[in-house]
């Protein structure tokens, strides 16, 4: 285990419980146990199988660390729920539900600001080009961390287009056989954008296609529902 994860384990445990607590009633129903007891079981799995093997990708200095550590809380929840006979689709539903309930508590002004920014694609381009440079500098120091590219001009039919070229979540899933979770983890992006009222569309993922994961915004479109999962809706999006 990298020293960063060892030192911050109490913080990660607190974050994990806060992330999963919104589906405490469903977890208790499936397991027949109190959420406090199940969350301890999930934490033990997470500490042993996730924290012990996570790559160091920049720690608190980069947002990607929170993406990696947060996403795999859901995977540990799923691995524990499997012990109680819960299937992958229901696990995916609980992942989506937990994130929806958590994101639903975000202040409304954040979504308003994001929607306003999306109506000014040039502003988004400038913001994300700076993020590309920051990610590239971090990746030079910490190989395997997120690498991104803002597509200018954006892909045809979209106001904004952004690619993840390297995704630590995908690489960790491949290395540790958590691939069944990746479509559901990617689907959580639709939860976040949907809560903010931003119409996200994706046709590529690093895990499935091996090239990049795209984030595309089409102004004036209706955000896709996050459940049933977008990849199962038959619209060609992932």
Feature locations, PLM:
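N-terminal, charged low-complexity regulatory/assembly segments
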Residues: 1-84
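Amphipathic interaction/junction segments at domain boundaries or subunit interfaces
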Residues: 69-175
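Short, well-structured alpha-helical interface segments that form or flank functional binding sites
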Residues: 72, 76, 188, 210
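Short, hydrophobic/π-rich interface segment
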Residues: 149-207
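Short, charged/polar, Gly/Pro-enriched secondary-structure boundary elements
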Residues: 169-171, 221-226
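C-terminal edge-of-domain segments
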Residues: 199, 206, 211-219
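Short, cationic low-complexity segments
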Residues: 230-238
């Amino acid at each position: 285990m990298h020293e960063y994860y060892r030192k911050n384990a109490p913080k990660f445990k607190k974050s994990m419980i806060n992330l999963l607590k919104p589906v405490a009633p469903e977890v208790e129903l499936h397991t027949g146990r109190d959420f406090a007891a199940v969350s301890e079981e999930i934490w033990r799995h997470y500490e042993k199988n996730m924290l012990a093997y996570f790559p160091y990708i920049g720690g608190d200095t980069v947002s990607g660390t929170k993406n990696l550590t947060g996403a795999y809380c859901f995977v540990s929840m799923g691995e524990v729920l499997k012990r109680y006979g819960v299937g992958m689709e229901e696990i995916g539903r609980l992942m989506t539900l937990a994130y929806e309930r958590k994101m639903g508590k975000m202040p409304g002004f954040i979504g308003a600001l994001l929607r306003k920014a999306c109506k000014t694609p040039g502003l988004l381009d400038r913001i994300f080009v700076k993020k590309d440079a920051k990610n590239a500098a971090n990746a030079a120091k910490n190989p395997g961390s997120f690498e991104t590219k803002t597509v200018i001009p954006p892909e045809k039919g979209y106001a904004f287009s952004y690619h993840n070229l390297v995704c630590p979540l995908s690489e960790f899933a491949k290395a540790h056989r958590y691939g069944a979770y990746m479509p559901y983890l990617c689907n959580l992006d639709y939860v976040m954008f949907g809560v903010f009222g931003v119409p996200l569309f994706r046709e590529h993922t690093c895990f499935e296609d091996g090239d990049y994961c795209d984030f595309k915004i089409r102004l004036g479109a209706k955000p896709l529902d996050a459940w049933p999962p977008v990849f199962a809706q038959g619209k060609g999006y992932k």
